[in-house]
């Protein structure tokens, strides 16, 4: 049974790609058709590739792999943080700092500074310092927390990256490639799939689409850690019903009637 059904993907708007003038020809094999100037992603392929991504992430988690969730665009920030935390993993949901992976030693020094300032706030040190100095420390702490809080407790360089919108996160992609870290990513019709190890053709702009797929990657981690008997059920997952959409022709019918509701541009 598929990890996500075609009906769930349709309800989340996963099938809506970008405008036809904004595409990468390498994504052609993942595109079913074009409607009203919008590319429509072939969800039959997406269903299968989500299964592949799920198994890949699950296998990594079962080997105690560290998974880093990356998504800094507004539509992804909340889901990236919440699902990474739910899976007991790590995340970057604001600006990716250059060298996060390739200069890990320097990043660790910044994380150490963040922890030191937090300790000062908790052990009463702030009470003994001038107000101006405390204000500066708080400002520094908040900035470090914003960019590094999601990887503060990451024990080592991750074994896998899950990325929403690899075009936007191109620096993270390049760093992972340099270190031979496999990438699982949601690739929209304007992305280069050749840069990604495990591809999920998907709308990466719609909040519901991002949430649905990100939550499934978190489920894969939890299942990998716990075993199949404890496979998780998420509240955010769309409900399965008997009236499953199971043909590409049905997709076209839905698209023709619903194309105006797309989030993609």
Swiss-Prot record:
The entry assigns this protein to a family as follows: Belongs to the universal ribosomal protein uS2 family.
HAMAP family, per database record: Ribosomal_uS2_B (MF_00291_B)
Q: Which CDD domains match?
A: RPS2
Keyword list, A-Z: Ribonucleoprotein, Ribosomal protein
- UniProt KW Ribonucleoprotein keyword: yes
Q: State the organism of origin.
A: Ligilactobacillus salivarius (strain UCC118) (Lactobacillus salivarius)
Matches recorded under NCBIfam families: rpsB_bact
Asked if the keyword tRNA-binding belongs to this entry, the reply reads: no
Entry's Gene Ontology molecular function annotations: structural constituent of ribosome
One GO cellular component this record assigns the protein to is: cytosolic small ribosomal subunit
* UniProt record, GO biological process: translation
Q: Organism's domain of life? A: Bacteria
Protein name (database record): Small ribosomal subunit protein uS2
């Amino acid at each position: 049974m598929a990890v996500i059904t075609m009906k769930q993907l349709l309800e989340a708007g996963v099938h809506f790609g970008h405008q036809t003038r904004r595409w990468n020809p390498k994504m052609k094999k993942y595109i079913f058709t074009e409607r009203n100037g919008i590319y429509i992603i072939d969800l039959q392929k997406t269903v299968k590739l989500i299964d592949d991504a799920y198994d890949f992430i699950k296998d990594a988690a079962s080997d105690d792999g560290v998974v880093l969730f990356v998504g800094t665009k507004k539509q992804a920030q909340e889901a990236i943080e919440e699902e990474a935390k739910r899976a007991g993993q790590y995340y970057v949901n604001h600006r990716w700092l250059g060298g996060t992976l390739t200069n890990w030693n320097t990043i660790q020094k910044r994380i150490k500074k963040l922890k030191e300032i937090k300790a000062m706030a908790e052990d009463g040190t702030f009470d003994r310092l001038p107000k101006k100095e405390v204000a500066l420390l708080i400002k520094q702490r908040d900035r470090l927390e914003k960019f590094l809080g999601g990887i503060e407790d990451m024990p080592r360089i991750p074994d896998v990256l899950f990325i929403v919108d690899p075009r936007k996160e191109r620096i993270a992609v390049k760093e992972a490639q340099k270190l031979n870290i496999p990438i699982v990513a949601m690739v929209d019709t304007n992305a280069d799939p050749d840069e990604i190890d495990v591809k999920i053709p998907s709308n990466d702009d719609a909040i519901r689409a991002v949430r649905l797929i990100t939550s499934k990657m978190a489920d894969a981690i939890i299942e990998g850690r716990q075993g199949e008997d404890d496979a998780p059920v998420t509240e955010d997952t769309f409900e399965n019903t008997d009236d499953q959409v199971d043909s590409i022709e049905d997709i076209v019918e839905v698209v023709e009637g619903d194309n105006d509701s797309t989030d993609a541009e």
